[in-house]
């Protein structure tokens, strides 16, 4: 029976298979045709892939490579420009130190003394403005320091320009003013019912008060600045004895520089700005940008140049450029220091850097033609203001730092045909970094961290610069930099230590750039033949640390 069972089962399976094929609409001819179609589709796909490869190769060689090469050349040119600008300024500082070209030797300076007959009336009338806006943590320190300045009380007017909208802050300011008035200080508070023009608008309106007309000079101190008692004694004589001097600017020092690593980085950058940029400008050209605070102005020079204007968010720089174009001289005093506080929160620092980069770029856009057609100053000074002061320091350095070191250099791993010379990626940035750290010797060991952090911040500065040049949507955005009042930190400890959630700490832009640089680093590690991936891994880490909120307090 088994002899008949096996053939039967074979026939049964074969018949069932054929029925299933027929039931699904298949046939032996269809199966063969399907095989041919699959082969044809495969060949077509291979052909399309070859065509895509050819198209990509052609696009890469004809479009992408030339464009990328052009961007590299542009960045190399900017590297040379920025390097020589930094070298020039440091050379000027070396000259100042070797030949001891202090302001006291260049300009006339004599100590102010009371006249035997008229008493303190031979002292000029000085107005001190303290602009503030809801800065409850720091205003007491500033008012106390300013009311303690050594100057005849009959020749001094302290003006608190309070734009605060918080009733508690207003009340606190009133209490502080009443306290000092009871001690014989001529201190007043000026308020308005709007915030038109922000800081510039407030100070401009305050200068229209009748009692200001008797004043010769005006000193400006932001709400977190604490001058030493001898500030006016040391600064005002330059204005009294040199009628062509319009501004005397002091150097900032920082009470919370050791708060965290971010404040140490800020100290390095700002020390370079004051000790190198400001002093070289003062020495070589008698011109620099007013820092908005810790300076004394000649009121007549301000008025001749049009006074405060609120057309940009850098009203201080705007005023300085206009006064400088009228032929006035500026004096920077490196040994006269004023204490103040650095922003210790990353968000506050980002807002500050946006304003400090957007405002100058926008002012550059607005004033270029005005500078070119100015007839009061020399061609050399106009060239210095346009090229060195604005283009190199306010535009080129930001574009170079971000686009070259965070975009072009990482992307170069995909274009091995293009060689980026080592002088532009190693020697030039190393020398520029050394120039910067010389202004803060105690932080020399932090130079690597400073470079990586500056590259991260260059993203925000470049964005702000583009908005300023193009007059984008945030061009006139004004956000008061938040300060924690470190001198009062014991009172604020419970508020400062509050932790943000993980989601609130994430900064998406930094994370996205970090992901891109990390991808370039991995590609360079696997396929590259250069050392770049070492730098790229470090830079990606810096973006991730900032992106996930592990910067600042």
Swiss-Prot record:
Main localization category: Golgi
Keywords: Cell wall biogenesis/degradation, Glycosyltransferase, Golgi apparatus, Membrane, Transferase, Transmembrane, Transmembrane helix
Xref: InterPro entries: Glyco_trans_2-like, Nucleotide-diphossugar_trans
This protein's GO CC annotations: Golgi apparatus; Golgi membrane
Pfam family, one: Glyco_trans_2_3
GO biological process, one term: cell wall organization
Designated name of the protein: Probable glucomannan 4-beta-mannosyltransferase 1
Membrane topology: Multi-pass membrane protein
Keyword field contains RNA-binding: no
Binding-site list for substrate: 222, 224
Role this protein plays: Probable mannan synthase which consists of a 4-beta-mannosyltransferase activity on mannan using GDP-mannose. The beta-1,4-mannan product is the backbone for galactomannan synthesis by galactomannan galactosyltransferase. Galactomannan is a noncellulosic polysaccharides of plant cell wall.
């Amino acid at each position: 029976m088994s002899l008949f069972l096996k053939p039967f089962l074979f026939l049964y399976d074969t018949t069932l298979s054929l029925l299933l094929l027929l039931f699904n609409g298949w046939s032996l001819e269809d199966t063969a045709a399907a095989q041919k179609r699959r082969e044809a589709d495969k060949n077509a796909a291979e052909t399309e892939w070859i065509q895509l490869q050819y198209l990509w190769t052609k696009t890469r060689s004809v479009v992408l490579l030339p464009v990328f090469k052009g961007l590299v050349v542009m960045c190399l040119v900017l590297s040379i420009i920025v390097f020589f600008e930094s070298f020039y300024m440091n050379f000027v500082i070396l000259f100042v130190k070797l030949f001891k070209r202090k302001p006291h030797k260049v300009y006339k300076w004599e100590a102010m003394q009371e006249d035997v007959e008229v008493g303190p009336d031979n002292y000029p009338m000085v107005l001190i403005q303290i602009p503030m806006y809801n800065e409850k943590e720091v205003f007491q320190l500033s008012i106390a320091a300013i009311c303690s300045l050594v100057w005849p009380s009959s020749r001094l007017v302290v003006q608190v320009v309070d734009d605060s909208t918080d009733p508690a802050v207003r009340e606190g300011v009133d209490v502080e003013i009443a306290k000092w008035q009871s001690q014989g200080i001529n201190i007043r508070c000026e308020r308005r019912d709007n915030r038109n023009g922000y800081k510039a608008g407030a100070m401009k309106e305050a200068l229209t008060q009748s009692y200001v007309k008797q004043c010769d000079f005006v000193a400006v101190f932001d709400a977190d600045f604490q001058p030493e008692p001898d500030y006016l004694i040391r600064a005002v004589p330059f204005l009294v004895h040199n009628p062509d001097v319009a501004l005397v600017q002091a150097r900032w020092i920082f009470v919370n520089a050791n708060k965290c690593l971010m404040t140490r980085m800020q100290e390095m950058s700002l020390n370079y700005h004051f000790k190198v940029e400001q002093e070289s400008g003062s020495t070589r050209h008698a011109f620099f940008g007013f820092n908005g605070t810790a300076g004394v102005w000649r009121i007549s020079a301000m008025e001749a140049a049009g006074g405060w204007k609120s057309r940009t968010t850098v009203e201080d720089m705007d005023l300085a450029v206009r006064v400088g174009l009228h032929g006035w001289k500026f004096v920077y005093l490196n040994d006269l220091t004023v204490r103040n506080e650095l922003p210790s929160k990353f968000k506050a620092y980002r807002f500050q850097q946006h304003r400090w980069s957007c405002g100058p770029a926008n002012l550059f856009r607005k004033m270029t033609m005005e500078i070119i057609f100015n007839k009061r100053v020399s061609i050399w000074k106009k060239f210095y203001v346009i090229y060195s002061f604005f283009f190199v320091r306010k535009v080129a350095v930001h574009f170079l730092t971000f686009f070259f070191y965070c975009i072009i250099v990482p992307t170069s791993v995909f274009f091995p045909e293009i060689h980026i010379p080592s002088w532009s990626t190693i020697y030039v940035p190393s020398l520029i970094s050394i120039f910067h750290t010389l202004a803060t010797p105690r932080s020399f060991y932090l130079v690597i961290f400073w470079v990586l952090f500056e590259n991260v911040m260059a993203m925000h500065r470049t964005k702000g610069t583009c908005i300023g040049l193009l007059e984008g949507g945030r061009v006139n955005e004004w956000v008061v930099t938040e300060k924690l009042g470190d001198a009062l930190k014991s009172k604020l400890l419970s508020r400062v230590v509050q932790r943000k959630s993980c989601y609130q700490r994430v900064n998406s832009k930094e994370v996205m750039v970090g992901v891109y640089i990390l991808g370039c680093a991995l590609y360079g590690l696997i396929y590259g033949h250069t050392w770049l991936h070492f730098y790229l891994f470090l830079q990606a880490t810096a973006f991730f640390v900032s992106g996930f909120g592990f910067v600042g307090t």
